[in-house]
Amino acid sequence: VGTLAEFSGLHRTTVRRLLETLQDEGYVRRSRSDDSFRLTINVRQLSDGFRDEHWISALATPLLGELLREVQWPTDITTLDVDAMVVRETTHRFSRLSFHRAMVGRRLPLLLTASGLTWLAFAPDAERDAIVSMLAARPEAEYQLAREPERLAAILARTRQNGYGENFRSWRQEEKIASIAVPVCSQQRVIGCLNLVYIASAMTIEQAAQKHLPALQRVARQIEARMEEEEVWYEMP
C-alpha cells in the first residue's frame, strides 16, 4: 500500500480502498505469505502484462497450503531472475518448523541451492550455458562451480536423473539448512521450481527425498495442470 501510494501520489487510505475494490472484483488477492497485494489470473481480461512469476504464484498458492499440512516443512515457489532464483510464494510464515519468515522476494544463488541447480539442470542448453558463462566470469567464491564445467555437468546430470536438485549445507549463508527441489514446467520448458526446506540435522537428502519427493512432484504436476487449464503458457523470448 505504501509503495503504491508513493508511486501514484494518492493517499494511503485511497489506495487501500482501491485495492480492496479490486480484491472484491477478483483482480488482486492478499498473499498469505506477507500480506502484500498480488495480481490474480483474472487480470488476463484487462492486460497481457501478467508475467510468468505472477501466474505460477497465483495458481500455486492454495496448493502450497495443502502441501504444508502434509509435509510440515516449509516450501517455496521460485522463478529465475537473471542470475538468481527468487522466492515468489512460500509457506515459511506458517510452518512451525521454519526459522525464516520474510522469504518472499529473497534471492537464492543458482549454484548453491536446490532450486538453482534444478533450474539449471532442466533449462534449455543455450539458456543454461549463457547464464553459467556469466556466473563464471564473477570472481566471488560462490560462483566457483561455474568455473568447473565437468563437476557442474556431473551435478546437473545427477539432478536430471534423480528428478530433483539438492543442497545440503552448501550455502554458507544458510549452513544449517538443506533442501530438495523439483521443476515446474510449461510446454516442456522449466518456468520455476518447487522446493522443500528443512534443518539439515533432521535428515539426509536421501531421507528427505524418500519421504517428501512424491508430494513435491505431485504438487508440481498439479500446478502444471492448473496452468494448462487456465491456458497459461510460457512465452519463448
Question: What are the language-model segments listed below?
Answer:
Residues 1-57, 221-226:
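N-terminal helix-turn-helix
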Residues 4, 90-92, 170, 195-196:
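Short clusters of small/polar residues that mark proteolytic maturation junctions
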Residues 26, 182, 194:
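Conserved GNAT-family N-acetyltransferase fold
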Residues 60-67, 132-182, 226:
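Short, basic/aromatic recognition patches
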